[in-house]
């Protein structure tokens, strides 16, 4: 499962991660826009509150069920065909590194129609191309209802591009996650 957000989406994504049970059937990859200038203990805090192991993705680490992987600040997070991560320092995409688009497209190339991707609040259009790419691979694309988003730009951009996306309220997103647990 892929989760992406920027401004206004952090609290909702963190709440979703806190609610994931230890038997959640999918590995989770999270891309949030965060500054490289400020050290963060997001993973450490969430690890204590989630039923899953919450970690910062490490280069060459294999994607595994039972884990939530956060893309590190200032690196694009890619998934290789062997299921391992690569940290990439190429140019920012839409002023963002990590880029939601880059990670979502990379994972879609491997898992295609087996992907569930959810895009939340954000102040850029990053994520919209990745969601379209996943939709084109027949993955399940879920967009936060823009009316529920603190910053509507990101979900609106994805909604404009994705014609088959599920558009869900915050409560509906939680209910959906509960249904696959």
Please report, for each region that a protein language model flagged, where it lies by residue.
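Conserved acid/base catalytic micro-environments in cytosolic active-site loops
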Residues: 1-181
């Amino acid at each position: 499962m892929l989760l992406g957000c920027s401004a206004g989406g952090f609290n909702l994504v963190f709440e979703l991660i806190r609610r994931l049970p230890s038997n959640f059937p999918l590995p989770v990859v999270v891309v949030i826009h965060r500054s490289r200038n400020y050290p963060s203990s997001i993973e450490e805090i969430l690890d204590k509150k989630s039923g899953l192991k919450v970690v910062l993705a490490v280069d060459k680490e294999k994607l595994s069920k039972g884990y939530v992987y956060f893309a590190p600040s200032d690196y694009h997070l890619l998934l290789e065909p062997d299921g391992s991560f690569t940290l990439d320092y190429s140019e920012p995409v839409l002023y963002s590194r990590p880029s939601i688009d880059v990670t979502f497209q990379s994972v879609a190339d491997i898992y295609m129609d087996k992907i569930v991707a959810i895009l939340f609040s954000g102040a850029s259009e990053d994520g919209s191309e990745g969601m379209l790419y996943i939709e084109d691979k027949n993955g399940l694309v879920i967009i936060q209802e823009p009316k529920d988003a603190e910053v509507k730009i990101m979900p609106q951009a994805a909604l404009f591009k994705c014609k088959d996306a599920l558009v869900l309220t915050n409560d509906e997103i939680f209910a959906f996650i509960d249904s696959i647990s």
